[in-house]
A protein has these predicted regions:
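Catalytic acidic motif of RecA-like/P-loop NTPases
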Residues: 41, 281-284, 307-308
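Hydrophobic residues in beta-strands of the RecA-like P-loop NTPase core, especially within AAA+ ATPase
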Residues: 276-277, 304
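Pre-Walker A (Motif I) flank of P-loop NTPase domains
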Residues: 18-22
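Conserved lysine of the Walker
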Residues: 32-33
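Alpha-helical nucleic-acid-binding subdomain
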Residues: 44-275, 282-290, 298
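Pre-Walker A adenine-sensing motif
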Residues: 4-16
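Conserved RecA-like helicase ATPase core segment
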Residues: 295-309
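Hydrophobic anchor at the beta1->P-loop junction of P-loop NTPases
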Residues: 24-26
Length: 309
């Protein structure tokens, strides 16, 4: 009878209706992990044809957990969702060299960010040059001029998206301009034969001026590929400086930095539909707030042991 009761309760969770947040509490060994995996399999089955594994994320406490469950869903006839740790998620989103391990951010600071960005106006000092290998490709002043093309668009994700697209065009024009210079042509002549073949699939031997420019552009696009990534990641925005100006806080904690970046740029995964967080009691409130904002359109399933909180 006890076993039947447990199975009945587990089935209720597995087949529970879609809700923004589903909290499952239980002590160690109570079957939470089994319920979690069966819930994922059930969601895939119920939404077959519309739900893809890339729409489902499992936030695990450590990489060992991912290894432990990697064969369970395939045995049930389903593919595995992406399984990551919170540390890995932060490492993907933070600038290079920034340690994901940091002091906790008070929730009040995150709510203050929500209020502060409503009145945000970008300043020149909030921007940085897009610069690689000592070459300034787009200046902070040029970025500010792009922003000023949209006087009726408030500072925030929409304006950042518009400027980001303008920056891609500006970078493309700058590289084409550089490709026509004699200095870049000289650089191509100094490439080793192996490098020429790798870049152009043949030794560098242009027959026309246009061919020479095309080869130069290919070379520059690879050389400055980091600039494309910097634009994509909105690294031309000085989030720390914006935070200091809006909040009066220097050296923002990781959670506050991420939250501010998401509020200003729209950073996030809007395609995620379900996010499962195991051992939820191990996360701080600010970490949960960051995940809720990053996966802003997703429904959450939270599993934890209140006795370990």
């Amino acid at each position: 009878a006890i076993t039947a009761t447990i199975q009945k309760e587990q089935n209720l969770i597995i087949r529970h209706e879609d809700v923004p947040a589903l909290l499952v509490a239980g002590i160690a060994g109570s079957g939470k992990t089994s319920v979690l995996l069966q819930r994922i399999a059930y969601l895939f089955y119920r939404n077959r044809g519309s739900l893809d594994p890339r729409h489902v994320f499992l936030i695990s406490p450590n990489p060992v957990f991912a290894k432990y469950i990697e064969n369970v869903l395939p045995d049930l006839g389903e593919r595995n969702p992406e399984t990551i740790t919170y540390h890995d998620l932060c490492a993907r989103l933070l600038p290079a060299g920034r340690n994901p391990q940091d002091k906790e951010s008070p929730l009040e600071l995150l709510w203050k960010i929500d209020r502060a960005v409503e009145g945000l106006r970008f300043e020149l000092a909030d921007l940085r040059d897009i610069k690689f290998y000592g070459v300034r490709l787009v200046s902070a002043g040029a970025i500010m001029q792009l922003m000023q093309k949209y006087p009726n668009v408030p500072a925030g994700p929409h304006l950042v998206t518009l400027v980001r697209e303008e920056l891609f065009n500006r970078l493309d024009a700058r590289l084409k301009q550089m490709a026509a210079t004699e200095a870049v042509q000289d650089e191509l002549l100094c490439l080793s034969l192996d490098e020429q073949v790798r870049l152009f699939n043949a030794p560098y031997d242009p027959q026309t001026e246009q061919e020479a420019r095309d080869c130069a552009l290919t070379y520059l696009q690879e050389r400055f590929s980091g600039a494309v990534l910097a634009i994509e990641r909105d690294e031309w925005l000085r989030i720390d400086r914006i935070g200091m100006r809006l909040l009066g806080v220097e050296n923002l904690p990781v959670s506050a930095w991420l939250y501010l970046n998401m509020a200003v740029t729209g950073l996030g995964n809007p395609d995620a539909r379900y996010v499962m967080i195991d051992e939820v009691q191990d996360y701080t409130p600010d970490q949960l707030a960051v995940m809720a904002r990053f996966f802003r359109r997703a429904h959450f399933m939270l599993l934890g042991d209140p006795h370990q909180a």
